[in-house]
Amino acid sequence: MERFAAVDDQYDPDAVEDGVFEYWDDVDAYEQTKAHRADGEDYFFVDGPPYTSGAAHMGTTWNKTLKDCYIRYLRMQGYNVTDRPGYDMHGLPIETKVEERLDFENKKDIEQFGEENFIEECKDFAEEQLEGLQTDFQDFGVWMDWDDPYKTVNPEYMEAAWWGFQQAHERDLVEQGQRSINQCPRCETGIANNEVEYHDVGKPSIYVKFPLAEQDGSLVIWTTTPWTIVANTFVAADGDLEYVGVDAEKDGDTERLYLAEACVEDVLKAGRYDDYEVVEELSGEEMVGWAYEHPLAEEVPDHAQGEGSGQVYTADYVEADRTGLVHSAPGHGEEDFERGQELDLEIFCPVGSDGVYTDDAGKYAGTFVRDANDEVIDDLDENGVLLSSEPGHTVREGQCWRCDTDIVRIVTDQWFITVTDIKDELLANIEDSEWYPQWARDNRFRDFVEDAPDWNVSRQRYWGIPIPIWLPEDWSGDMDDAIVVGDREELAERVDQDIDPENVDLHKGTVDDLTITEDSTTYTRVGDVFDVWLDSSVATWGTVNYPEQTEDFEELWPADLIMEAHDQTRGWFWSQLGMSTAATGEIPYKQVLMHGYANMPDGRGMSKSKGVLIDPHEVIEKHGRDPMRLFLLSVTAQGEDMNFSWEETAEMQRRLNILWNVARFPLPYMRADDFDPEETTVEDLRDDLELVDEWVLSRLQSVTEAMTDSMDDFENDKAVDELLEFVVEDVSRFYIQVVRERMWEEEDSASKQAAYATLYRVLESVAALFAPFTPFVAEQVYGALTGDAGHPTVHMCDWPEVDADLHDPALEREIEVVREVEEAGSNARQQAERKLRWPVTRVVVDVDSDDVADAVRAQEAIIADRLNARAVEVVGADDEWGELQYSAEADMSELGPAFGDDAGRVMNALNEARVTEQSLDTLEGTVREALGEDVDLTEEMVEFRRETPEGVTGTEFTALDGGGVVYVDTALTEDIESEGYAREVIRRIQEMRKDLELDIEERIAVDLTIDDERVDSLVREHEALIKEEVRADELDGVEDGHRKTWEVEGTDMEIAIAPCEADQREASEQASGD
């Protein structure tokens, strides 16, 4: 880019971003930036891998934008940042998408299609989606190593999972066992608790009588899952709860029912009983050992009948709710299973992986379990044990996270990493990480880990990392007799078949056929694949291709930083902790940034399937990449959800337009004056810096310090706020306005050079400060300023550091007062309808604080300039402005009771009174003179009103620890009118210059005709000023040119302008030289 080259008048995101993309490609900006930091301190960032199951949405866009922002920031701080992106390419997220594409309904369709064919389809789909995501992320301006992403389907990554699993096995943390799991009947696989999503469903609510076997009466239970009664094994009671036996009457018949005392009324009401009598009181402990008959014994002949089945036991999960007795089926419910294990009871689960009853379910065999609910209820009724049944009871039901099928809980053989054996180690490792926000670690994450069950790592699916366990045919269940393979080299050495470890595909199609024979025993691989969360759990070492390569792992691990949304406390944050602790005993990450979800503007969650979403491509098309990024980064990244806002994104575009205009403003002047930033620096011109230069440079140091602190604390939103306020308020609305006339000076001067050097330093730093947030516009601004003299890209710049020599907080406080005074003065002008172009005779600043008074006195010149005032007067905190008066508004509700019949006279006197201070004593003296007698006034009786002299308006302000009032005297004098009209003419001529798109150096001739002779005379008094400001050689003699009629303060003015001919300009210059 050419230094100080002209740029477009308006910020056009599309044009800027297209140009910068092309520029980055031309100069290899990303590659050069990485090479520039190659010798810096290593920083190991690990990318949480998104599933390659769909296009980028606003959530992934926010996530990748945050990552890109911090990677760029860290590089600018000198770090050599690992930036390898990752993709989660296995598991149900991919499989279900492929099933949809192939119009499959269940696993049977897959088996008919062929496992290997299905695996190939999944591989192709995942790679296809990966390309789309890569394109999207690059299009958002994200800089990562897109040429070398880690893919969970690659052999070197898959063996990273194998290695971790083998390490866990060597620590005796791997076992096969039965557990109650969440089973998706459509996908026919177990899913983890953290993968279950919940929704409200209506279910039957039934009370059932379990007839006692050895005494009269029945136990009463309540359930919303009638289908699980088929597998009932015991009834649970609370040992300390009070239970009763009641004789309940209905239709003339009496039966004995046992239930919790607190539940009697509600249960009998549900059963429509006429009356009851309590005949027995006992505790839950006293009921232990009571035997009962299975309510579906005839329908399910092979029901649970093992030793101890069909009895009452105590359990911790029982509450005094419904009946106080809980039907328990260890073959289904998790708590039921755990209690059944403690009691060494039979685990009876007559349900297959597809949710269909097996032959063990007797009458119900071949029926999908939920479809059997009505039949079970009918049979219970037919058997005389249904006490009550009502439909539509709303409960939270779990469903598969990928296909939305309601899950069933069944007990199956699964492979587990027994994280419960290392719970203390897990909790201790959490303390070795810093979280942003910290409460996410100390509350949400710690609570989840404390309650985490053993990790079911096996899935009965196809597209995943095969579990590397080989077992003998008659395996005893002892893990010492199992072979767990940790990498490809070991696999090649141990299997019976001849394979090439460098090229072997580790997916099911290959490894299922591999056998191991040792000591005359042949081992075959178990058929399951890993839970897909185990894939990503090894990302910190999989990113650096460990164990295949060891050097980077030994130098970099554990990760310095990871960042994802808050759902990953139950997902990736947990799986990494669990796997790493199991494999290595250590936590795999040092810092965690946990952001929220991306929501719709009204707070609803986004959902592609429901058509409720914001497409990032649509945002880019409407507003551009940088405005979208800036909005996303202006939202806190620490734990809170983000509601997308079109309005705020548009506002970010407007603010970047202000940045654009600020950066564009000095370019033509610097170019015209051949300004050399390397030869003319702020340091070289320290003695020539004006006070406003020193202030803006100090503000730059304060902003840099605040932004650095915020970014180091992962508070990017605060950093954005600091930067935007600086550019919009400090630079655009204040500094540029103050300094522009110095840049317009015809002749070179130390003041002009100081202004150039100051603004150059500010803009160069601002470009660097914007770079992590808005990389495109930052690149454009930096290139326009530096050209070939700077780095090839702004992203190679160092992050700005605070220069203590330029930092003057005291001066900043003084200018803060100036700006508050200016704002108040501008408001007072507006009240008086006096434009800023028209000077005023004076501004009076009446303050109530010595600090504010000192600041105003120190900066009188700037205040006068900013408010276009001929003079500034300061009235100190202990003084009164002698020209100010106060009137008193009387409150008759207070005067009446105090003065009776004289209240009217007192009120009239008060209304006429004028005093010079807000003092009751002074007011009483004035009223005494009017009435000829003393009056005693209170604060409640009157309210003082400030009255300014004619032509003076005032506005209050606050600054530092005080404030005051700014009074503007707008009284007109002939001199003020003369300058005011001249400024109006100047503004019109400047607009006409813009119409002709004249270069700032191009001189013109002006023809001015004013209808009003007096106004014409006033304007002519400032001909020299007009000519200087608009670069006019003369104010007469334009025959053609650009001509316009203006109305100025009620007076018509005809103005014509035309560029001067070269010879005319030369003649003019020669004449002026003579």
UniProtKB/Swiss-Prot annotation:
Main location: cytoplasm
Keywords from the UniProt entry: Aminoacyl-tRNA synthetase, ATP-binding, Cytoplasm, Ligase, Metal-binding, Nucleotide-binding, Protein biosynthesis, Zinc
GO terms under biological process: isoleucyl-tRNA aminoacylation
SUPFAM superfamilies listed in its UniProt record: Anticodon-binding domain of a subclass of class I aminoacyl-tRNA synthetases, Nucleotidylyl transferase, ValRS/IleRS/LeuRS editing domain
Keyword Zinc part of the UniProt annotation: yes
Residues that, per the record, bind ATP: 608
Subcellular location: Cytoplasm
Cofactor(s) essential for the protein: Zn(2+)
UniProt GO MF annotations: aminoacyl-tRNA deacylase activity; ATP binding; isoleucine-tRNA ligase activity; tRNA binding; zinc ion binding
Residues spanned by motif 'KMSKS' region: 605-609
Family matches, as Pfam families: Anticodon_1, DUF5915, tRNA-synt_1
Described purpose of this protein according to its UniProt entry: Catalyzes the attachment of isoleucine to tRNA(Ile). As IleRS can inadvertently accommodate and process structurally similar amino acids such as valine, to avoid such errors it has two additional distinct tRNA(Ile)-dependent editing activities. One activity is designated as 'pretransfer' editing and involves the hydrolysis of activated Val-AMP. The other activity is designated 'posttransfer' editing and involves deacylation of mischarged Val-tRNA(Ile).
Family membership: Belongs to the class-I aminoacyl-tRNA synthetase family. IleS type 2 subfamily.
Subunit structure: Monomer.
Protein name: Isoleucine--tRNA ligase
Organism field: Haloarcula marismortui (strain ATCC 43049 / DSM 3752 / JCM 8966 / VKM B-1809) (Halobacterium marismortui)
Gene this chain is encoded by: ileS
